[in-house]
From Swiss-Prot:
Membrane topology category: Multi-pass membrane protein
Record carries keyword RNA-binding: no
Entry-linked InterPro entries: LptG/LptF_permease (IPR005495)
Spans through the membrane: 7-29, 49-71, 95-117, 137-156, 232-254, 259-281
Primary residence: membrane
Localization in the cell: Cell membrane
Pfam families: LptF_LptG
Protein name: Uncharacterized protein aq_539
GO cellular component: plasma membrane
Keywords, ordered alphabetically: Cell membrane, Membrane, Transmembrane, Transmembrane helix
Length: 285
């Protein structure tokens, strides 16, 4: 009975804590994206939410284990249940073993998902969502104003249907001045009669009758592969820290915490240390 109770409490509180932390982080992210959310299709937005919450709930499992372990030990001490356990010859070691069962469950699941749930996949989903918004944005650029989206700055004096006239276009080190500009979709811009100015080391000016610029050609495939590998390393470290913080949380909560504030202080300390470890690993990659 005690084993089942501990399993239920730790699993429920760990998942709930991890999910709440993922929602807090999501709220901060949505605050940054608030100016573009209304233009994103509902289906794509929901897909982003699912991927985000799946990854960050997984990522915050160590925090969930830390807090749920401290809360469980605090509950046992506040209710004087430890003395009851001792009277039935249930030792600290046996309680530790009971707590280890849900911990091992989380550890094994986290290890199995370490190559699947990746931070870079969340970033890719966000970029894909913004790319679809970009399609709508560039197709409806108003005339007479300077507008920017990501690394692109665009201005046109007039608009006729899908064609912009007397256009100014800047992307990174490339500036294009053209009489006509049409957005073809999928990141492709088609210019007619104008000038291309590049700014790599020296300025180069080239006149053209027709010029096509594909923004996707500037995407770096090797960089994405590198980030995928880095995401896997972060997951491995995250999983590897689980046994340490579970053991420390159980031991400290059982032996050294006697007042309400001490539980929160030690739990907060362990969470900060865990995030510092992840931060340092990311800096080293």
């Amino acid at each position: 009975m005690l084993r089942a109770y501990i399993f239920y409490r730790l699993v429920k509180n760990t998942l709930l804590t991890a999910f709440i932390l993922s929602l807090i982080l999501l709220t901060l992210q949505l605050t940054r994206l608030s100016n573009v959310l209304f233009g994103i299709p509902f289906k794509d937005f929901m897909g982003f939410l699912v991927v985000w919450n799946a990854y960050y709930t997984y990522f915050f499992i160590p925090e969930g284990v830390i807090l749920s372990t401290f809360f469980l030990m605090k509950h046992f001490k506040d209710k004087k249940l430890l003395h009851v356990f001792y009277s039935f010859r249930i030792s600290d070691f046996r309680i530790f073993l009971y707590c280890s069962i849900p911990f091992l469950t989380f550890f094994l699941i986290s290890a199995l998902l370490s190559n699947t749930l990746l931070e870079e996949k969340v970033a890719f989903t966000r970029k894909n969502m913004l790319f679809k918004l970009q399609e709508k944005f560039f197709s409806e650029v108003p005339a007479g104003t300077f507008v920017s989206f990501g690394a692109v700055v665009l201005h046109a004096e007039k608009r006729e249907g899908n064609t912009l006239k007397e256009a100014f276009f800047k992307f990174g080190d490339i500036t294009v001045l053209s009489e006509y500009l049409k957005y073809k979709g999928n990141g492709v811009f088609e210019f007619r009669r104008g000038t291309v100015i590049t700014e790599e080391e020296n300025y180069f000016v080239v006149k053209f009758n027709e010029y096509t610029l594909n923004l996707k050609q500037f995407q770096k495939k090797k960089l994405r592969e590198k980030r995928l590998k880095e995401s896997k390393v972060v997951n491995y470290v995250n999983v590897a820290t689980l046994p340490l913080f579970f053991f420390l949380s159980f031991t400290v909560a059982l032996k050294f915490c006697h007042g309400g504030l001490s539980y929160y202080a030690f739990a907060s300390l362990f969470i900060v240390v865990h995030q510092l470890i992840i931060f340092v690993v990311k800096l080293m990659l």
